[in-house]
UniProtKB/Swiss-Prot annotation:
InterPro entries: KH_dom, KH_dom-like_a/b, KH_dom_type_2, KH_sf_prok-type, Ribosomal_S3_C_sf, Ribosomal_uS3_bac-typ, Ribosomal_uS3_C, Ribosomal_uS3_CS. GO terms for cellular component: cytosolic small ribosomal subunit. Residues 218-266 are annotated as: Disordered. This is Small ribosomal subunit protein uS3. The gene is rpsC.
């Protein structure tokens, strides 16, 4: 079922971590989860031009710590930090607790699945051919170190009457391998013909997670041939030397036990 399950949820606690890191009892869990969803939707709309990859929310001791991963941190911070202060004030009003906002830069946006998906949807909204947008994104990702990438688009592609799905893949994308670092993201393009969905899988190589153990090399076997053994022959030989273990000894060789020429036994 590796082809169907969500790649991030499949690898949680093995090689990936949660995007919301807090604990709540049964009474408050639903409200806090809904609050996280609202915060992420607000940040996605507010920072649409800042190339935000993901948002991590932590809640330590009646506080909130929000980490925003962006390839353009200057757009998030703003001139002299004005935009980040306004953002912090709005988040405190929404969450009702003191909020600390951290900005982390994404060094290689061409290999980030969320940024790739958002870039393709923006091009589709500008009426760029979907095949050109997908292949260009794949070439950039492979050029900057990705070991494999798969992109899928579904909907009324190029304005056709019947919706269809098309996907392209380059390199390896091992979805069943738990130690594989698979970055997965989705995005939607709102066009005049309807919504076009985009899914992106990026394989960045294998990683040792918290539950992975180092691999112990096996001791090499002694591959020397056995004495008088015939390769591939499992049947007992007539002289009784070969064959499978425990095989019945063969008949005596011709001439065995006979007296030598010119001599007679007593």
């Amino acid at each position: 079922m590796g082809q169907k399950i969500h790649p991030t949820g499949f690898r949680l606690a093995v090689s990936r971590n949660w995007a919301s890191r807090w604990y709540a009892n049964n009474n408050n869990f639903a409200a806090m989860l809904q609050e996280d969803i609202g915060v992420r939707e607000y940040l996605k709309k507010k920072l649409k031009n800042a190339s935000v990859g993901r948002v991590v929310i932590e809640r330590p001791a009646k506080n909130a710590r929000i980490t925003i991963y962006s390839s353009r941190p200057g757009v998030v911070i703003g001139k002299k930090g004005e935009d980040i202060e306004q953002l912090k004030t709005e988040l405190q009003r929404r969450m009702g607790v003191p909020v600390h906002v951290n900005i982390e830069e994404i060094r290689k946006p061409e290999t980030d699945a969320q940024l790739i998906a958002d870039s393709i949807t923006q091009q589709l909204e500008r009426r760029i051919m979907f095949r050109r947008a997908m292949k260009r994104a794949m070439q950039n990702a492979m050029r900057l170190g990705a070991q494999g990438i798969k992109i899928m688009s579904a909907g009324r592609l190029n304005g056709i009457e019947i919706a269809r799905t098309e996907w392209y893949r380059e390199g390896r994308v091992p979805l069943h391998t738990l130690r594989a670092d698979i970055d997965y993201a989705t995005s939607e393009a709102k066009t005049t013909y309807g919504i076009i969905g985009v899914k992106v899988w990026v394989y960045k190589g294998d990683t040792l997670g918290r539950n992975d153990a180092p691999v112990v090399e096996e001791v090499a076997e002694d591959k020397r041939p056995r004495r008088n053994a015939r390769p591939g022959d499992r049947r007992p030989r007539r002289d009784g030397e070969g064959g499978a273990p425990g095989a019945r000894r063969g008949a005596p060789r011709r001439g065995a036990g006979k007296p030598e020429d010119g001599k007679t036994g007593e």
